[in-house]
Amino acid sequence: PFSWPLLAQLPRGDGHPVLLLPGFMGDEGSLSALKLFLGGRGYDVQTWGLGRNIGFQRRHAQALEQKIRHLHHSTGRRVSLVGWSLGGVFALYGALQAPECVRHLVTLGSPVNVGPEGSQASPLVKVLYRMVAHPMGPEVHVMQPRVKRLREHLLPDVPMSCLYSLSDGVVPPQEATVDGPAGRCENIRVSGSHT
């Protein structure tokens, strides 16, 4: 509530499509406040329409790419992707697969920079991921060809903004930020927790 006066001062959107991607175990409802805010600022806000995010899966990745391409072609405008936590990994993947359709990539506390040695996330996060998504935990995705491509070609040819917090508690700051060319990539430190 204390941030509403500051948020009200932000510039209005130009009506271009913005696709919101939920974090691990989140669904469209988990981003309802963000959807309401961005819609009120003049953006054409869409949700991913794939239900609960239960991990980085091929069917979701393919459906996301199709949705990005459909939004781009149906509106005639490039799409901004906003992904929270694991949703940011999906957004990064979508931007790499369809850069000609993406205007801007925004990640919110997303593990977009996990090295081949695996995530430094807390043990609790890893246990939860093992229980829901895959028994090997988040490290299983580091070995997959799709994620290997993310590591090798981390930066899509679109502007990218990574929001991170030193007090995130789930995704370490070094995994939520990227090094890239100035003017195309920015890391923005914010105050707050992961949720």
Language-model-detected regions and their locations in the chain:
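A broad structural signal for short, well-ordered beta-strand segments within beta-sheet-rich domains
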Residues: 14, 102, 182-184
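Short hydrophobic/aromatic-rich motifs at helix boundaries and adjacent loops
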Residues: 5-8, 37-41, 181-182
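C-terminal catalytic-base region of ester-bond hydrolases, centering on the histidine
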Residues: 156-195
